[in-house]
Amino acid sequence: MEAEAGGLEELTDEEMAALGKEELVRRLRREEAARLAALVQRGRLMQEVNRQLQGHLGEIRELKQLNRRLQAENRELRDLCCFLDSERQRGRRAARQWQLFGTQASRAVREDLGGCWQKLAELEGRQEELLRENLALKELCLALGEEWGPRGGPGGAVGSGAGPTPELALPPCGPRDLGDGSSSTGSVGSPDQLPLACSPDD
């Protein structure tokens, strides 16, 4: 039974001689069938390995193509990044130039505005001074008009023949022109100017 369980290669010559012819043929066929089944299984395994190998080779080819495409995209992205970086540097330089220009322009505008305000203040002061002068002249003309009113007024009787002495005679009073057009007392035909008798003989 132990000899039957083992293969023919495990039997000695004496054991093989002790076995019958039919037993030897049966064992030989059984071993051939086992070897054939092993060969078939090995062939199937080889086919599976070849199929997997072909699949891996296809994946490798696809990965190579993908790698080439990614490398091309990488080059394009690198070129784009270089271009964008140069544009960024150019934009920063332009921004600095515009900032410098804006600073200089604002400084010039502030200086011009300060000069304009100073001139405006001077003009306002001059205008106030002229107004004060005009008011003083107006008051002076009114006072002189009251003092040298028409004959028969407070200065003398009508038809008395008495007149002011030559020492008190007034000089001719012409219209005063201040030259700036802001005074209303020195203009001819002004409504607030009284008809003054500039000379006692008038």
Swiss-Prot record:
UniProt entry tagged with the keyword Cytoplasm: yes
Listed transmembrane segments: none
UniProt KW keywords: Acetylation, Cell junction, Coiled coil, Cytoplasm, Cytoskeleton, Differentiation, Growth regulation, Nucleus, Repressor, Transcription, Transcription regulation
Region (Disordered): 152-202
Pfam family, one: CCDC85
Protein name: Coiled-coil domain-containing protein 85B
Annotated function: Functions as a transcriptional repressor. May inhibit the activity of CTNNB1 in a TP53-dependent manner and thus regulate cell growth. May function in adipocyte differentiation, negatively regulating mitotic clonal expansion. Plays a role in cell-cell adhesion and epithelium development through its interaction with proteins of the beta-catenin family.
Annotated coiled-coil segments of the chain: 44-82, 118-141
Main location: nucleus
Family, per entry: Belongs to the CCDC85 family.
Subcellular location: Nucleus; Cytoplasm, Cytoskeleton, Microtubule organizing center, Centrosome; Cell junction, Adherens junction
Biased composition range(s): Gly residues: 152-162
InterPro entries with a match to the protein in the record: CCDC85 (IPR019359)
Top-level taxon in the UniProt lineage: Eukaryota
Residues annotated with N-acetylmethionine modification: M1
Assembly mode: Interacts with CEBPB. May interact with CEBPD. Interacts with EURL. Interacts with MCRS1. Interacts with TCF7L2; competes with CTNNB1. Interacts with ANKRD26. Interacts with the beta-catenin family proteins ARVCF, CTNND1, CTNND2 and PKP4.
Keyword check for Repressor: yes
Gene Ontology biological-process annotations: cell differentiation; negative regulation of cell growth; negative regulation of DNA-templated transcription; negative regulation of fat cell differentiation
Compositionally skewed regions (Low complexity) per UniProt: 180-190
